[in-house]
Amino acid sequence: MRIEDVLGNRQRIKILKILNQMGELNVSEIARRIGANHKTTMRHLKILEDDGILQHKMFGRIRLYRFNINSEKAKAIQSLIENWEKTEQRGLAFQNH
């Protein structure tokens, strides 16, 4: 999948940001946090998992999603998110002075 396909969707970006911050979450919690229904959330998670960016593990009947630590794409996206958020924080600090 091309980077514009991953980052060109607002809900996928929200999923990636939330998982980067929280570590791992179940589908219902991800859906609640991005403001989407279960079916839409599952579709986005499947796209990200099929591309190797995310992975899931089963905890009983609950499916928990997280970044795939073996994926270079996942590492690059996590780095991008972290650097972007640091830049935003510095920008806010600069505006408040």
Task: Please name every model-derived segment.
Residues 69-97:
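Amphipathic alpha-helical dimerization/coiled-coil segments
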Residues 49-59:
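A short, conserved structural fragment
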Residues 39:
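Key DNA-contact positions within bacterial/archaeal DNA-binding proteins
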Residues 1-14:
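Short alpha-helical segments that sit at the start of domains
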Residues 58-64, 70:
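Short, Lys/Arg-rich nucleic-acid/phosphate-binding segment
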Residues 22-26:
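Short capping segments at the starts of secondary-structure elements
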